Amino acid sequence: MLMKTTAVHAPASQGTSGIVLDSLRVAYHGNVVLKPLSLTIEPGEVLALIGPSGSGKTTVLRAVAGFVQPAGGRILIGDTDVTHLPPYKRGLAMVVQNYALFPHLKVEDNVAFGLRAQKQPKALINERVTQALKTVGMSDYATRYPHQLSGGQQQRVAIARAIAVRPRVLLLDEPLSALDAQIRHNMVEEIARLHRELPELTILYVTHDQTEALTLADKIGIMKDGSLIAHGETRALYHHPPNRFAAEFLGRANILSAIALGITEVPGLVDVSCGGAVIRAFSQGSHHGYNKLLCIRPQHLSLTPRSAYSNRFNATLQSVHWQGDLTHLLCDVAGETVRMVLTHVNPLPRVGDKLALWFEPDDAVLIEV
């Protein structure tokens, strides 16, 4: 979604501020697009909101920015209730996907725009512009115009303009979606470096790209149909997703039918009947019953055991696809299809071969249907 507004010009701020959404609700013409949502983003934290188109993630960001009036709930930035404050009084800055640079202004003047709107002293403006351009690696381009820059360079300038006003919070609305793959990859690294240099900055990052979220975020929230259906630390959410949608949206996952048999002597692990075998898996919920699912990431499967506690599925190889450093195998496990991704496989197995697929108990997660 392209937006003409580029940034919310923040008043100069000191220290760090988090974001608290308290039962935030948004409706357009009586149609609820964001169901009551409660979420806390800690000071200095990067939270990525991901989800399919129409899931509500951009609505959340626009509500925090002040461009959407909530139908209910509260928005706090730091200790301040900003629910009914105009955007320019919220102490934040925003970067969107279409850069929205002023074409008639040089790079340095684009970066200085928010500071001049604040009527800051000239010496301070020059200092902040110099620092911001240095931070994003654009010092040598200060006197160029936007049309003389690549897409990646323009986005760096947009980020420099946002951080120059020293916001408490930085909002990023799919800032890399208009870039090609290689530039997008480089910009992900640039944003990660930016946060290392500005660790006090709280960032709300909206994206549909799971790689961006996994690379940049301390925590991830997954949206679906106007609701937050999963939220947690990035690694924990990836390795132990709470439900099928989260498992399949955040990376590729094998989802198999399973029956929980009961707890084991190891905290967090349960015995599970799955794939024609009794295995052990991680569980966050109930430990008994039918209608469960087992989630295993393709890269967590191997052709050799990694420990004395490894689980094993017996499988028949259906197809092999070699892709340079990676080999993708499609296997049949008790009538269900299982994908695995391997590195440095030599020799390659052949279609029809009988294989043993090994995986660690903590890499298999029992989830609800």
Swiss-Prot record:
Residues 19-250 form the ABC transporter domain. GO terms for cellular component: ATP-binding cassette (ABC) transporter complex. The gene is phnT. ATP binds at G51, P52, S53, G54, S55, G56, K57, T58. Keywords: ATP-binding, Cell inner membrane, Cell membrane, Membrane, Nucleotide-binding, Transport. One of its GO terms (molecular function) is ATP hydrolysis activity. The keyword ATP-binding applies. It comes from Salmonella typhi. NCBIfam families: PhnT. This is Putative 2-aminoethylphosphonate import ATP-binding protein PhnT. It is found in: Cell inner membrane. Belongs to the ABC transporter superfamily. 2-aminoethylphosphonate importer (TC 3.A.1.11.5) family. It is a peripheral membrane protein. Probably part of the PhnSTUV complex (TC 3.A.1.11.5) involved in 2-aminoethylphosphonate import. Probably responsible for energy coupling to the transport system.
